[in-house]
Amino acid sequence: MRRVLALASGAEARLTNEHGALAVVLVNGGTARAVPGTWSATSELLTDALAPGFPGVTFAEVRYRVKTWNELPSCMADAEAALDLVDAAGAERTLLVGFSMGGAVSIGVAAHPTVDAVVGLAPWIPARLPVDGLVGKRLDVIHGAWDRWLPGIPGVSPTVSRQGFDRARALGVGGSYTLIPRGLHGAAVRRPSGELQPLPGWRAWVEHTRVALQRFVAGPAPSPAPA
């Protein structure tokens, strides 16, 4: 059962397993053009697959006001509003899951006090994006090996996400980098009818995300060792 709530920013969040002691906030990708936000097919598939097995975890899918990488601060404000929502509802810790452009959004708001860890799914991590907000957190990146640069999508590829991951690691951020063999860009797309169409290898996206979620549920990220 999902419930849609308005966020303070004007965006929306779709909640599953409300009132959990822990929370997962899922943020979507975007486009070059400023278009109204939509619900992410990949986030929806992951929520459908994982939420029943984690009844004590609230899943909050975010629909931006406008989804475009040319207005990242707006998308980040929407993600922060969702973090504030689950925090106010009593979530003790939050896992951010960002798909595509949502990877940049998640890293950009990772310093929020409720965030414990970030999972980037085929994430866009541009070289100009600061990653210092991840210090003291955890970053797990999952990327499809067959994901490549596409027209209009700036720098979404395993090579670029690995470079972003390595920048975070250089700051002492813990985490993992996983390539899904023959994996594409995410786990699902949406048909014109509105139904989900899983992409080849979608089960691998679910299972790798499940592992990250299990780790999150088991306990907070360890503090980095003193330099």
Stretches with model-predicted labels:
Residues 47-68:
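Conserved alpha/beta-hydrolase
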Residues 2-54:
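Short, surface-exposed "cap/lid" segments of acyl-processing enzymes
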Residues 135, 140-147:
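Short beta-strand/loop motif that positions the catalytic acidic residue
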Residues 69-89:
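Alpha/beta-hydrolase active-site loop
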Residues 38-49, 146-175:
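Active-site-adjacent alpha-helix of alpha/beta-hydrolase-fold enzymes
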Residues 97-106:
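Gly/Ala-rich beta-loop-alpha elbow adjacent to hydrolase catalytic centers
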